[in-house]
Amino acid sequence: MVSVCQVERNDVENLNKELFYSYIKSNKPVVFEKYRSQAIEKWTPDYLLSIIGDREVHVNMCTFGSMSDIVPMKFSEYLNKTLKNEFPINDSNGERIKKINKPYLRNFGMLDEFPILKEDVKNNESIFNKDVHNMVVMGSFIGCKDSATNFHKDTGENLVSVIHGKKFIVLIAPSDETNIKSKLSHDIEVQFDSNDFGSPIELHPAFSDCSKIYTTILTQGQSLFIPVGWIHYVHNIDTTISVSCWGKEMIM
């Protein structure tokens, strides 16, 4: 049985660059429990609909697979179905749809297309030192209840902040990457609790050779720092809106 640990938590009131970069230097994930953003109060469903409306978006089924995983629909349709939990539970053959195949709005450039929304989360971007991370990219994510990503890693230091909802996140250090049985991690779902499908992470056969796994639950008003190269899995326990900010060191 693999050892499972909780991600460290820090309740600092005002996150500053010095503290943030100390975690980057140590290559260590951490939850900052007191994330402040205007978006937490402002981004109600009605507000987002008033800004974005019927704009066509491409909704992903997060297998990170082929283009057939992408379904076009109106933003208003996606958000309303998500809030009402109206997406199908079973496929056309009556089989239960896996979490990684449930709708997840993750490639919509909401913050770039609607600067008024980006203004609400600008403090995420400002935590990065542009002399070190000379490219900072921001993205927004809206996931329906029980949607999930597959296990993957990012190419930049990632600060993910929850605006609404709740996420269950699993993290694995780069030193354990070769110990992951990738096919099993895709074929057998990770179980969040006894009401969920799949295998509990500590008993999951895909990770039996890993030395340690970290988990956390990230809720509204909290941010998680995911160091570059760390493998992670994200399960939206509820309908969830979040923002990620990646700091990258690019050769100029």
UniProtKB/Swiss-Prot annotation:
InterPro entries: Cupin_8, JmjC_dom
Gene3D superfamilies reported in the protein's UniProt record: Cupin
Database matches in PROSITE patterns: JMJC (PS51184)
One MF term in the entry's GO annotations: 2-oxoglutarate-dependent dioxygenase activity
Disulfide bond residue pairs: none
Residues annotated as domain JmjC: 103-252
PANTHER family recorded: HYPOXIA-INDUCIBLE FACTOR 1 ALPHA INHIBITOR-RELATED, JMJC DOMAIN-CONTAINING PROTEIN A-RELATED
Protein name: JmjC domain-containing protein A
Organism: Dictyostelium discoideum
